[in-house]
């Protein structure tokens, strides 16, 4: 394990950090924030940079390509042949970036990578540029240690910050090559601090609903209609209360799940960890 740690530390300084720094220098914004994303070549440049870096890491059985269809965003698609296992692992990340807000601290800028106190500052480094570098390095270490792994598929999209408009399309169109994953890792979550590797077990979901309430066939003056015609907002509030009680904050049973005891135990351990910190 000591030698493995030394190897990873060396790779980080010699290859990963320089690769991430070069990635930061590319101002490839998510399509929602760049109307010329399909013609200015920035997304293509960033995607090819990631692919070229990955192919240089010596991972056995790796095939990589930048998938692009007209009118759709770019997708870094990497396949790694199985070695001693018939399982399939799907890993996800994204390489598009949110728009910068200028120089938010002295000496720091969006496309100017700066290492300060052992931390890399630059737009898109942690959200979510690190993903491919972490994935490939992990697989490289497994192979160097003689470990076995199943078929590995890596998908790094370029539209996450714009709502992932093409992710489902690409997953379907490439399903024949992806197969049926036995496990999936999403390399795009948060962390409590930078002293450990954090694993997110679950996130709260969201349901988007478009609701239109009509009470009258034609408009009436509020001075004569109020109190007689039902108020549309009141009707909407009643409807929402059927799902989420505004008085008790309880949601309807079909939308609620029981929290497993082991997750409650995890939360308590996390609270103890934060208290110690």
Regions found by a protein language model. Give the residues of each.
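Generic secondary-structure signature for well-ordered alpha-helical cores
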Residues: 25, 55, 144, 175-176, ...
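Conserved active-site and cofactor/substrate-binding residues in soluble primary-metabolism enzymes
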Residues: 11, 15, 41, 45, ...
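N-terminal helical capping/dimerization or prosegment-like subdomains
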Residues: 1-103
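Active-site-proximal alpha-helical scaffold in enzymes
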Residues: 129-145, 164-172, 230-242
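Histidine/acidic-residue-rich, glycine-tolerant segments that coordinate divalent metal ions
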Residues: 149-230
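Active-site metal-coordination/substrate-binding segment of hydrolases
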Residues: 86-156
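Acidic-enriched catalytic cores of C-N bond-cleaving enzymes acting on peptides and small amides
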Residues: 177, 192, 201, 222-277
């Amino acid at each position: 394990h000591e030698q493995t740690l030394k190897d990873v530390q060396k790779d980080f300084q010699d290859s990963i950090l320089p690769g991430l720094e070069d990635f930061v220098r590319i101002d490839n914004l998510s399509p929602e924030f760049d109307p010329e994303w399909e013609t200015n070549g920035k997304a293509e440049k960033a995607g090819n940079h990631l692919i070229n870096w990955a192919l240089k890491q010596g991972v056995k059985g790796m095939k990589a390509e930048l998938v692009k269809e007209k009118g759709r965003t770019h997708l870094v698609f990497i396949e790694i042949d199985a070695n001693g296992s018939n399982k399939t692992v799907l890993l996800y990340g994204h390489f598009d970036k949110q728009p910068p807000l200028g120089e938010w601290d002295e000496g720091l800028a969006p496309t100017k990578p700066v290492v300060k106190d052992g931390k890399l500052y630059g737009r898109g480094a942690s959200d979510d540029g690190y993903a491919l570098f972490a994935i490939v390095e992990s697989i490289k270490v497994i192979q160097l240690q003689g470990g076995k792994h199943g078929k590995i598929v890596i998908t790094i999209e370029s539209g996450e910050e714009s709502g992932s408009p093409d992710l489902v399309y690409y997953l379907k169109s490439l399903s024949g090559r992806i197969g049926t994953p036995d496990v999936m890792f999403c390399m795009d979550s948060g962390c409590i601090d930078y002293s450990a590797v954090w694993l997110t077990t679950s996130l709260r979901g969201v349901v988007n609903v478009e609701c239109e309430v009509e009470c009258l066939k034609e408009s009436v003056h509020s001075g004569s209609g109020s109190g007689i015609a039902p108020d549309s907002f009141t009707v909407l509030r009643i409807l929402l209360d059927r799902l989420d009680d505004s008085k008790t904050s309880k949601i309807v049973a079909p939308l609620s799940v029981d929290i497993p005891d082991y997750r409650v135990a995890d939360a308590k351990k996390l609270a103890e960890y934060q208290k110690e910190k």
